[in-house]
Design a protein with these regions (language model features):
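Dynamic "connector" segments at or just before major functional cores
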Residues: 1-201, 207-220, 246
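An internal, acidic/charged active-site-proximal segment
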Residues: 195-270
Length: 270
């Protein structure tokens, strides 16, 4: 966020040293911590590669796709999740730098421009981004792994209540999306992110996604042993059968019920 000093103040008796507040006409920023992250991104080519998965069908544009991707990515990293924040951040010198511009260059994209940009993303582009995420995960390994343990988890993502496919979830007591992440226990990397509507069942599309992941991993590493773990939300016959057909090991939690309790009491007492 932009900061700008107003009045010069000198404190003579705040300890052993004189403290002086100096007026500056230059716009300052409280988000300089993004600069080393942007340097890491430059070396990895992450945001540039991400933006390359999107199509730009605009006949005329003032803001490049990669700039808008960086605006949103680095904004979220800095805690500015709302598009409205960028009505202020678009003139922040640090955000200009991390987007690829000079600090004294023209302002970045406004909130309406960012909204149009995000709403223009197609289903095909989302599939490309899923594939891109999986390829980035594969590239995170220096050597072919002997085995992989994939954790599949569902997270709530609160919303303002008016976005497309956001619904009120009684358990979380909020309007939300749900995010399903496939992460790797060996290196904590995200292998496959999926955004679901606010009241979606945890199992929605999980087996097609898992099949897609397993087939790609085995195409790259034919001998890798794959196992996955999930909570009781994934416990269903079609998930067990699908995992067996993919020849993967799996550990899935079970919700407590009277039959399970009765059959497990003796074992749990050991």
């Amino acid at each position: 966020m932009i900061l700008q000093t107003v009045l010069p103040i000198v404190f003579e008796e705040l300890g052993p040293k004189r403290v002086e507040v100096e007026v500056s006409q230059t716009q300052l920023s409280s988000d300089a911590g993004l600069l080393p992250i942007r340097e890491l991104d430059r070396r990895l080519g992450w945001t540039e590669s991400f933006a390359a998965q999107l199509s730009d069908n605009r006949q005329w544009s003032q803001h490049a796709l990669v700039e808008m991707v960086r605006q949103r990515v680095f904004g979220i990293l800095a805690g500015y999740e709302d598009q409205n924040d960028h009505d202020t951040l678009r003139s922040d010198p640090v955000f200009k730098v991390v987007a690829g511009r000079s600090p004294d260059d023209n302002n970045l994209a406004s909130q309406p421009t960012l909204s149009r940009f995000e709403n223009a993303v197609t289903a095909g582009e989302l599939l490309r981004l899923e594939a891109w995420s999986l390829e980035e995960f594969i590239r995170s390994f220096d050597q072919p792994p002997h085995s992989l343990t994939l954790d599949i988890d569902l997270f709530d993502d609160p919303t303002h209540g008016e976005q497309q496919l956001t619904f009120f979830h009684g358990h979380y007591d909020q309007y939300q999306y749900q995010v399903r992440l496939v992460t790797c226990a060996e290196n904590d990397a995200i292998a496959f992110p999926v955004l679901l509507h606010g009241t979606a069942n945890a199992r929605l599309g999980v087996m097609p996604d898992l099949e897609r992941i397993v087939r790609r991993l085995r195409a790259v590493w034919p001998d890798v042993v794959i196992r996955w773990r999930g909570d009781c939300g994934f416990g269903a016959p079609e998930v067990y059968e699908g995992s067996e057909s993919l020849d993967v090991e799996y550990t899935i939690g079970l919700a407590m019920n009277p039959v399970l309790k009765q059959n497990s009491e003796e074992t749990l007492q050991l």
